[in-house]
């Protein structure tokens, strides 16, 4: 199950994830623990403090007192925090079961926020089920998408800001998914740096099967209570977990899993995997590994690099056993142990094997290669299946815009292609991006020819149109080692 925003063209308009100038907050590499201390109460001073000042105090308390359970956080869900959350939401998102859109709520914002704040603090706020919707997947299947109601989004966004002040001090350095100041490219940089700088010969690419649908509510709440002792916050999270979904007026209960795609879902997922995987994996590496181990996790997608094959095999068995204790399993087809690294080609050749194996992570195929001087070089190329799916989505998009003028089609294609290039234009991937632009040009040429049998759109004319409307291909990201070192001069990759 997913909660999301039901935006059109979501398959083909990639987010702008080029150089992120913000540094990630520091993290503590330690296990979470219960405590019974109560942080200083802030109600007397909150009227004279901004929301950022209050969160800074929570952040500092979480950093200084590692075992503290925060018992007074709910009062930080102020009218100011709720209004700021509302203003941060997408204005074009689809409505949930309540039928309320952003612009509708904004017409009487102060009154609506005051009423929501009153219901929250009087205990009469009720979470709404997600409105069930289906979106196509790259493999042709459909993925269920739950559209949350607007007020649920508002409260979740405000609470996530508060809880992040606590948990960003706890999460491990190798955890990258959906965290403030961290992006997919930061995870890719960390992995690339670890593979290049560290002696890695084996890569375990692990995917947790149906993770968001299999999260145990009981275990999740127990994990949250390691740090959060405010029962009003706990009750609020329980409401969202059990709100269920609604499809064509029929309500469905949710006895397990998190509302994937909801504003709060990524944080809940990170909390769950922090206790189930991150702390355990870090401890296993320190106690049992006989060689180098590099780890990077982005949500439920995990890549671990090993120096020795025996470590990789032992870790895989131990990981499967660990996940099973908490109701999770690894996907049998998407989890692979790959021979990889600077010695992979030589070692495989000595055994009569073929070229070194590859693995996929966050949209890129990672390849063991060599530079012109014969030294090991990590090559990253856009996954062919993902590019094929994107081109198909562009073809469908052009079909929907059949009768648009050429400038209207050109503006749409420019936005789509630029979004794709923003993510995929990394060093070494220029040839794939050039092919992508050529394929898009050809799709546009064919679309123009089909809409009129008398259209004489030749390759020459199509290339002229592409020169006007489509962005030129160029490398938009620095080398991963350079960017990782600039962001984390003292941190080891995959630490």
Identify the function of each model-found stretch:
Residues 1-495:
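Non-catalytic terminal/accessory segments
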